[in-house]
Amino acid sequence: LSNAALLPAIAQDVGSAEDLGVMEINLTDAVRFNWGFQGALQGAGTPNQAGIGGFLPLSVGDNSVFFVDALANVNFSDRNGDSSIVNTDVAGTTISTSTRLGYRWLNSDRSWMYGVNAGYDSRPMNTGNADAFIRDAKSVSDRQSVFFQQIAAGLEAVSESWNFNAYGLFPVGDTEQVLNDHYLGGALSTYGLDVGYAITPEWDASIGYYYQHGDDLTANDANGVLAQLGYEITDGLTLGVNVSYDEAFETRVSGNIEYRFGTGNATEVEKKTWQTPVIQALTESVKHRDVRVHDANVKVKEVEVVQVCTTKTIKLFGKKETKKTCTTYTTTPTSKTYTEQ
């Protein structure tokens, strides 16, 4: 065969989505329920954790999917003397949850996937000692178990080479709570954008910017950067490393692992086209699900007990008597003041 005869065949391997056969894929075959396990090491305001998750397509169209993505993780203790929330060590064990309701769709030639999602995350948190006290062989007192929660929203766009992810995390409910006699903890609002690039079919890298802020004493407003590198070892098994920096948490390095069953629905003949980043993105788990917590160094003081006395003189049978009445005002559990150290 001449070189000219080979050119059309070569072009089909590196051409458009239609040339690659993506247009022939039936999404009902590619978009199915999948579930699996995930785990992560502690990061900037996030715990050591491992759990189970699942992706459930509620409705699959010709070019779209309406879905629920849910996770439940067991949260473990921080490394001793290395707090994930800056000062107070997180103690195990609690169970956090995350749920997303979303819609993803392909453009007309299936070269891009777009998505929108929103949901709710919860995080109970037990507290241990504080790093500064551990170094001095001391201990904080009145350690509390607290509960934080947030609502979240995200936007996605994925092509064969590029991926974009914008997200917002918005704490709700009691966003600041007493952790112990020295520290107050608060859930952080976080807004971010990640831009990723598929280096090879197995390697994916991204760089992101985020802005975080809290309420009152745990404000810690800060701009941050997040670099991520992921490697797909086999179908469904992915390892990742993450490096972040901001003024509140400074540099944090963490790792993550994820395995999903039910991701190999295509036949071997279809496997190459079915596993393109655009088609795979339709069933990937939504990113940025953790309730991020930061603590602040404060002195928790009970309101002082106050005794108020009144004296009244009365005349009884021609004799004067003085009667003293005292009222004591005591502290209630909510009567606490917080002052910066």
What are these regions (language model features)?
Residues 46-52, 91-97, 112, 147-151, ...:
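Residues that define the transmembrane beta-barrel architecture of outer-membrane proteins
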Residues 52-56, 99-103, 153-159, 193-197, ...:
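Residues on the lipid-exposed face of transmembrane beta-strands in outer-membrane beta-barrel proteins
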Residues 61-68, 108-116, 161-166, 201-207, ...:
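Repeated loop/turn-to-beta-strand initiation elements of outer-membrane beta-barrel proteins
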Residues 6-19, 177-187, 192, 204, ...:
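Flexible, glycine-rich linker and terminal segments associated
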Residues 39-45, 58, 72-78, 105, ...:
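Transmembrane beta-strands of outer-membrane beta-barrel pores
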Residues 41-50, 62, 75-81, 89-95, ...:
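Solvent-exposed loop/turn segments connecting transmembrane beta-strands
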Residues 38-41, 76-89, 129-143, 176-185, ...:
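Extracellular loop and loop/strand-boundary signature of outer-membrane beta-barrel proteins
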Residues 138-216, 224:
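Detector for outer-membrane/organellar transmembrane beta-barrel domains
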